[in-house]
Structures are given as C-alpha cells and as structure tokens.
C-alpha cells in the first residue's frame, strides 16, 4: 500500500519530500520503530530516486537522533517539531548527537500549552492557562525564525513550517496557535512571518494589542485569576489599534477550554 502511494505521487510537481511518521517516537519506545522507518525509506529510495526522505520528531532528543543515525541511514533529512523555549537548543542537540545531514523545523510557534508550568504566572489556580496576546505571539514568531532558523542555513537548516498557518480547530485553547481566525482575518503573527520571509510587512496590517493591560475583565488581567459569580454582570475591555488607521469591529466570543 505504501509503495503504491509512492508510485502514485512520485511525479507530482508539488511533492518536495516523503515524510515517514509524524512524532512516531512519542507513541512508541521499541527501537524497532526506527528499523521499520528505515525499511520504508529504503523502499521509497528504490521507487522514487528523485525525492528525499525524512521522519519528524516531537523534539530534538539526542538519544532519538542517535538511534536514527544508527538504525535509519536511509533518512536523508531530519525534521523536528519544537516550540519557543526548546527551539534554540535544536542545532546543539543535532550536533551533540552527531547528525551531519540537513534538517528542517517542521513545526514552530509560541510556548506550547504543555510548557506553561515553568511560568507560574501563566497558570491559574484551577489549572487554566493565560494565553499570550496576539502581539506577544508576533514577537515570538519573528524572534524564533530570525534567531534559530534563518541564521542556521549554513548549519544545515533547510527551512521551516510555521504552526499553524490557518484556523486552529484543536488543542486546549482554541486561539492558541492559529494565525488566522475563523473568518480568515489574520493575526499579527502573519505580519511577522511575511516580514521574516520577504523583508516587508503586508500593506494591510493586523490590529495590535500593545500590552496585557489592554485586555481586561472587571478591571483585571487574566493572570489575576478572575472569578465571577453565576448570573452576574461583568465587563470586558480590550484596547486595540490598527497600524493602517482602519476602523475596527469587535466580535466577542465566550469559549470553553478543553
């Protein structure tokens, strides 16, 4: 079945690389996983000699990389999914493991929801998470790309995929990763990525929320652990500006965290 898929798509002009498994090591501990991935990569090389192979890791764990070097020599490019606090360490981990082939960052973005515990002010007493503002995320995306991806081209980094280029439909917090809202309007992170890729911002910029003090409920910020009573009246306030001077329309949504 896999070979049939390769034969079907190997000459498609949109095909760049064959990715064998996405974060497979997160679900399996048996080292035979890498033998299986290598067997698939070998089959792909025999069936389609014109496209490289990769496998995608959930982190740049040195031991996992060493296992791939030893057991999966038919992997041409290593792909890593990683987020704000861990991205700077990827290149060092690759070098420590002895990886000498190219690599890609196949997911990057702000601090993940599972990475908030080191920042206690971002975790509320009942376990809820304090999301970054769209402007804070914009800064994180731009910094991540400029300081850890673009600068490492000569160190084997082929490029990256920003997460998530679209409307987010999964995760604990509905607006955590998506760079677009449900209607297709952009968040500032889209501006950041266009600037990172082209050196110019888009002509029509996304609205800006300057500081955390510009998003309040009953005069408090989210990290103030706001508690409200059932059937009570509460006031939410957001202060936003548009870099282009466009008029803004405000849509309020109340969403349950998963």
Report the location of each language-model feature.
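Active-site mouth of glycoside hydrolases
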Residues: 1-75, 81, 88, 99
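A conditional alpha-helix N-cap/helix-loop micro-motif detector
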Residues: 34, 84, 138-141
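Conserved protein kinase catalytic core
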Residues: 62-63, 87, 113, 170
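Short, acidic/turn-prone active-site loops that include or flank metal/cofactor-
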Residues: 82-85, 108-110
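Substrate-binding clefts and catalytic carboxylate motifs of secreted carbohydrate-active enzymes
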Residues: 95-257
């Amino acid at each position: 079945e896999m070979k049939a898929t390769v034969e079907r798509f190997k000459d498609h002009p949109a095909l760049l690389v064959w990715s064998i498994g996405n974060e497979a090591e997160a679900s399996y501990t048996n080292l035979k996983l890498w033998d299986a991935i290598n067997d698939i990569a070998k089959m792909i090389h025999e069936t389609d000699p014109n496209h490289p192979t990769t496998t995608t890791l959930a982190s740049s764990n040195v031991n996992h990389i060493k296992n791939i070097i030893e057991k999966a020599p038919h992997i041409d490019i290593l792909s890593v999914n990683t987020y704000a606090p861990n991205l700077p360490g990827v290149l060092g981990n690759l070098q420590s493991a002895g990886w000498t082939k190219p690599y890609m960052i196949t997911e990057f973005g702000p601090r993940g929801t599972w990475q908030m515990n080191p920042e206690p002010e971002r975790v509320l007493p009942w376990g809820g998470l304090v999301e970054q503002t769209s402007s804070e995320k914009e800064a994180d995306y731009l910094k991540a790309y400029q300081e850890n991806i673009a600068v490492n081209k000569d160190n084997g980094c082929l490029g990256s995929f920003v997460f998530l280029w679209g409307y987010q439909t999964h995760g604990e917090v509905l607006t955590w990763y998506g760079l677009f809202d449900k209607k297709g309007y952009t968040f500032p992170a889209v501006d950041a990525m266009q600037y990172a890729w082209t050196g110019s911002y888009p002509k029509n910029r996304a609205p800006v929320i300057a500081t955390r003090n510009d998003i309040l409920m009953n005069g408090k910020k989210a990290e103030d652990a706001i508690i409200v009573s059932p059937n009570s009246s509460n006031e939410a306030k957001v202060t936003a500006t548009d870099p282009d001077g466009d008029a803004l329309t405000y849509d309020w949504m109340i969403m349950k965290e998963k």
